Amino acid sequence: MNIAKLIDHTILKANATKEDVMKVIEEAKEYKFASVCINPTWVKLAAEELAGHDVDVCTVIGFPLGASTTETKAFETKDAIAKGATEVDMVINVGALKDGDDELVEKDIYEVVQAAKGKALVKVIIETCLLTDEEKVRACELSVKAGADFVKTSTGFSTGGATAEDIALMRKTVGPNVGVKASGGVRTREDADKMVAAGASRIGASASVAIVLNDAKDATDNY
């Protein structure tokens, strides 16, 4: 298994400098990761630097809380695509899900999917650490109904990250034709292998190089 091609090489910390982001981009070229996952302010740079390389440009929408309006998320998506994003990872409206407002949650996802249609993959971050199992299932079902390409465990900025149990539940819920992304706390090759065995088809990690080299040093970030 080519683990590198399952990894979104990620830098989302608020204090990331251009030098930090360029390092991630160069590592993505070298190790041929699936994508770089960066904040929207870096999308144009990443798209320019990765032109001609088989590495997608992934960014985040409504991140990390998911509490911005649907209209804002749709605009962010269009803006990111215009600047060169080919994948977007959006955060659901977690509070609305917990309120039982499934209509709002689905519309939120649907509008991002429509904004990205034919131009970018949409991954839906459900923030598993804040949800009950029943809520995780509902979030996955609403994501599929709204037309998302992937469901994703975590932002890496909340109270917990991916677990093999959550990945298995998400995979069981969405079936074989929708992607499942494990992110948050995946720091070693052993972690990554566990997630893939549980049903993950993509891994979000900042410790991507350590994972590929099977090297635990440098693997300290939450993402």
From Swiss-Prot:
Keyword Lyase assigned to the entry: answer is: yes
Highest taxon of source: Bacteria
Pathway as given in its UniProt record = Carbohydrate degradation; 2-deoxy-D-ribose 1-phosphate degradation; D-glyceraldehyde 3-phosphate and acetaldehyde from 2-deoxy-alpha-D-ribose 1-phosphate: step 2/2
Catalysed reaction, written as an equation: 2-deoxy-D-ribose 5-phosphate = D-glyceraldehyde 3-phosphate + acetaldehyde
- Database matches in InterPro entries: Aldolase_TIM, DeoC, DeoC/FbaB/LacD_aldolase, DeoC_typeI
Keyword Iron present in the record's keywords: the answer is no
Checking SMART domains in the record gives: DeoC
What EC number(s) does this enzyme carry?
4.1.2.4
Q: Which UniProt keywords apply?
A: Cytoplasm, Lyase, Schiff base
Q: What is its main location?
A: cytoplasm
One GO molecular-function annotation for this sequence?
Answer: deoxyribose-phosphate aldolase activity
State the compartments where it is located: Cytoplasm
User: A Pfam family this protein belongs to?
Assistant: DeoC
- Please provide the Gene Ontology terms (biological process) for this protein: 2-deoxyribose 1-phosphate catabolic process; carbohydrate catabolic process; deoxyribonucleotide catabolic process
Active site residues per record: D89 (proton donor/acceptor), K152 (schiff-base intermediate with acetaldehyde), K181 (proton donor/acceptor)
Q: Mind telling me which GO cellular component terms the entry cites?
A: cytoplasm
Q: Which family does it belong to?
A: Belongs to the DeoC/FbaB aldolase family. DeoC type 1 subfamily.
Question: What does it do?
Answer: Catalyzes a reversible aldol reaction between acetaldehyde and D-glyceraldehyde 3-phosphate to generate 2-deoxy-D-ribose 5-phosphate.
| Protein name (Swiss-Prot/TrEMBL) | Deoxyribose-phosphate aldolase
